[in-house]
């Protein structure tokens, strides 16, 4: 038996008047996901337990089969693992976004989806100018980077994800509580370093958003995981452009497969990801394939971009993997789902249950649900499930 878990980050949404009160999933052309729903079993999954914020860290940890109530310690330490940054017992890792501030407001949480090459120059400059015995900077991908603070600094600081406060006044959401003043000062110091940096001057000349500030959030200590093999008896791999997902995979003992051209945006290498997944399953039991683009489009509030991201996910990820599964001599089980909704109307994550569909190529008792979307799956046989139980269900379907 082979297993494929296909995650369209942030795909779920709310009904949109412009689409005749349908969601984007309902309006999008998604024949591959519809086929999986029609020939498989469907339901709704709660990926965010009560008391947890609806972050991709919590939601994807659940999808990977790890209960956040047991394993979650913060987002940034997971990203640190993917970046090869080892954390000491008293190290606190922070996500460090490169953002755009304009007229005292957070204009763009991603600095115009700045390129990794430009971002690395800026982060290296920040590390050179602002690094101390207390904090170190590490470059990541695009706008997503890392700060590591020693001696438990910032462990209890109250921070807000920048994608939750786009358009809001920066000063209203600076880090608060214990050590908040230190990290607020670090943010302010970063603007001095970045504002007139040659990379940003060039971006402004080109009409792009400058990366003129950092923003810290998502901090935590290194978590302790049981491996996926220990929990579920399966070998596996993760394919994603995003350090968070790769970090979860590393802690779970999964192989991390790097795909050239995987960007975490609409221009990602879909075909490369699908091919890598098919190749990975030749020597492993299970593969997770994660696509970030629908989530990014949701944060931008773009109906058109989110529609395209979902349709590309369906035609360029789900479809080729489904066709491979159906042509294979081995039995395949495919799970398709988002991790959480990222509605374009609110431009951030919500904690609503998400639709899922499970299809086994030799199954004979499908639910007969016609479409894969937030409403149709409610007619499936699986009901409402705890997402961290899904992997266990998957290997038993």
Swiss-Prot record:
Belongs to the BPG-independent phosphoglycerate mutase family. A-PGAM subfamily. It comes from the Archaea. One of its GO terms (molecular function) is phosphoglycerate mutase activity. It catalyses: (2R)-2-phosphoglycerate = (2R)-3-phosphoglycerate. Coiled coil: none annotated. SUPFAM superfamilies: Alkaline phosphatase-like (SSF53649). Catalyzes the interconversion of 2-phosphoglycerate and 3-phosphoglycerate. It comes from Methanosarcina acetivorans (strain ATCC 35395 / DSM 2834 / JCM 12185 / C2A). HAMAP family: ApgM_A. Transmembrane segments: none annotated. Signal peptide: none annotated. Gene3D superfamilies: Alkaline Phosphatase, subunit A, Metalloenzyme domain. InterPro entries: Alkaline_phosphatase_core_sf, ApgAM_prokaryotes, Metalloenzyme, Pglycerate_mutase_ApgM, Pglycerate_mutase_ApgM_sf. Pathway: Carbohydrate degradation; glycolysis; pyruvate from D-glyceraldehyde 3-phosphate: step 3/5. Its EC number is 5.4.2.12. This is 2,3-bisphosphoglycerate-independent phosphoglycerate mutase. Keywords: Glycolysis, Isomerase. GO terms for biological process: glycolytic process.
